[in-house]
C-alpha cells in the first residue's frame, strides 16, 4: 500500500469515527451537580399538565398536543413503583392514552413499560436530568412503526420540567418531541 493510499484510508476511517462521535448523546452524569435535584417519584406524583409539539427533521411543527398526567407511587416488592396515566389530546382532535409503569431498580436507575413501548424503557437520572431510551410502536396512517426515542427531561424548578426527545429509525433522525410539564 502506498503512502497516499494509507493516508486516504486513515483519513476516511478518522472522519467516520469523528462522525459517529458527533452522533452520541451526552452522559446524564454530566448533570450530577445541577439543581434542583430531580426525584422522579416526587415530581411525577399527583396531577401534571403538559404542552407539547412534534417537529419533523426540518423543524416544521407537525402536531401540537396537551397531556393530562396523573401519577402515583407505591412500594411493590421492595421497589419504588410509579403509575403514570397520560391522556393526550392532539390539535386535530384525536386522543390517546398511555399508562406507564416505572420501577426504580437502583438509585437513579429506572425501567419503564407501557402498552406501546417495545420491551422496556431504560432510564437514568443525575442532578436535574433524566435520560430515557426506548422503542415505541408508533401508529402512522394504517401502519405501525417501531421508532427509537432518546428522551431527555430537565427539572428547571420544583414545578416545571422541560422534555426533549429525539425520534429516529435505523439511526436516521425523524423529528423531535418537545414538552413542558407543569406540576399542580
What do these predicted ranges mean?
Residues 2-11:
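Bacterial N-terminal signal peptides that target proteins for export
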Residues 19-22:
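C-terminal motif of bacterial Sec signal peptides marking the signal peptidase cleavage site
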Residues 24-27:
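Bacterial signal peptide processing site
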Residues 29, 73-74, 90, 151, ...:
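Sequence-level preference for short, compositionally simple segments enriched
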Residues 31-47:
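N-terminal helix-cap/turn-to-beta initiation motif at the start of protein domains
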Residues 51, 56-140:
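Central antiparallel beta-sheet cores of small beta-barrel/beta-sandwich binding domains
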Residues 61-68, 144-149, 173-177:
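Amphipathic hydrophobic-ligand
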Residues 150-184:
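Glycine-rich, aromatic-bearing surface loops/beta-hairpins
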